[in-house]
From Swiss-Prot:
InterPro entries: Longin-like_dom_sf, Longin_dom, R-SNARE_YKT6, Synaptobrevin-like, V_SNARE_CC. This is Synaptobrevin homolog YKT6. GO terms for molecular function: palmitoyltransferase activity; SNAP receptor activity. It is found in: Cell membrane. The modification Cysteine methyl ester is found at C197. It comes from Debaryomyces hansenii (strain ATCC 36239 / CBS 767 / BCRC 21394 / JCM 1990 / NBRC 0083 / IGC 2968). Residues 198-200 form a propeptide. The lineage of its organism: Eukaryota, Fungi, Dikarya, Ascomycota, Saccharomycotina.
Amino acid sequence: MKIYYIGILRIGGEKALELTSARDLSQFSFFERNGVSQFMTFFSETVSQRTQAGQRQSIEEGNYIGHTYTRSEGLACVIITDKEYPVRPAYTLINKILEEYLSLHPQKDWANISATNASFNYDNLEHYIKKYQDPSQADSIMKVQQELDETKIVLHKTIESVLQRGEKLDSLVDKSEALSSSSRMFYKQAKKTNSCCIIM
């Protein structure tokens, strides 16, 4: 599971404008990185421009999926992942990023600009692209599910060890039943012996 790109874009006019972005291109060779980076920007601008406000879309392109959400303010976030990255954590992260970005850069700051500049950068994107390579970090439900799965594994191990003990307990129970049978046998034998010698 891998996140390759996170971008925040201003929607409106003829073309979307990338305000800030972060990329993890470590899986690509040095010579591919520039072309891949340009393609990711182009893909993000195209997809976000064609996503209506309030709508979420996941678009598959080759081995990659672009998850996008456009807010009513005209701000969109695009995350490009591989096909294995779960959808819910991607959208959870998109919502988080857009909320934080809007609190730092209100709509009036970027609504009417024609070109981006360093003042629109959002340094947390670099942190997020590293941290959220593990999708359970973005999605608390997924994190709880992962913890439950781990607990389930521990419980299965505990149950297996109890069953092994249980097998030993069963053999003890069998032995105690055997004692009980021999005790019964002794009792019956003693009863027979006592019954044949009746004193008159």
